Regions:
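GT-A fold catalytic core of metal-dependent nucleotide-sugar glycosyltransferases
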Residues: 28-79, 86-87
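Catalytic core and acceptor-binding pocket of nucleotide-sugar-dependent glycosyltransferases
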Residues: 89-172
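Short loop/helix-cap segments at secondary-structure boundaries that form the rim of catalytic
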Residues: 11-13, 38, 57-63, 142, ...
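Short, solvent-exposed loop/turn segments at secondary-structure junctions
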Residues: 2-4, 24-26, 51-53, 71-76, ...
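A generic structural signal for well-ordered coil/turn residues at beta-strand boundaries
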Residues: 80-81, 144
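A structural signal for short, well-ordered beta-strand segments and their strand-loop junctions
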Residues: 20, 45-48, 67-68, 123-128, ...
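Short glycine/proline-enriched coil/turn segments at helix->beta-strand junctions
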Residues: 13-16, 23, 39-43, 61-66, ...
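N-terminal anchoring/stem segment of glycosyltransferases
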Residues: 1-29, 41, 151-157, 162-172
Length: 172
């Protein structure tokens, strides 16, 4: 609910449909691959639920499959981050490839779908369109961006945390 609230109130984005994929058919982040099977046409824009949108977002719609370049983290992990994804048209081959041997691929790509997308698919990356709370937990809001990622620190979105970002969530 926070994501829809932030999109509707701060992002400036217009959309035809807002959907949260809740099917838990796979382990963790691999569930988000189902969106490539469900959405096979038109312009698509995906956001992880653990982000903060606090201002008008730039145009993130892309023709080619596009993810974030994870410029904020150690390269030893992966240089991709799938907290924001866009594509136009049919990218169902991503899900179909995963679905054929999902059990094996979940183990092979223990770092998650970022690693799988980077190693197995032709994926573009955005320029710097957001930043991570990683190493910025006590810093003021970065006015150079309109989106901050929590990157597995979603606990900081819970009541009791008093960072600047909580002002952009649904009133509690």
């Amino acid at each position: 609910r926070n994501l829809k609230y932030m999109i509707d109130n701060y992002s400036g984005l217009k959309y035809d449909e807002f959907v949260v994929i809740t099917s838990e058919n796979y382990r963790g982040v691999f569930n988000k691959l189902q969106m490539f099977d469900i959405y096979r046409d038109g312009e698509n824009l995906y956001f992880d639920l653990d982000i903060c949108i606090y201002d008008k977002v730039p145009n993130l719609i892309r023709k080619d499959l596009t993810v974030l370049h994870a410029w904020w983290r150690d390269r030893a992990h992966t240089s991709f981050n799938s907290s924001i994804i866009s594509w136009t048209g049919d990218q169902s081959h991503v899900y179909e490839t995963f679905k054929k041997d999902w059990y094996y691929l979940q183990g092979k790509y223990y770092k998650g779908i970022d690693e799988m997308l980077e190693k197995d698919f032709d994926v573009k990356t955005y320029d710097k369109v957001c930043y991570s709370i990683q190493n910025n937990e006590y810093e003021p809001k970065n006015k150079d961006y309109s989106i901050m990622l929590f990157n597995q620190r979603q606990f900081m979105m819970e009541p009791g945390w008093s960072g600047w970002w909580s002002n952009y969530f649904l009133p509690r």
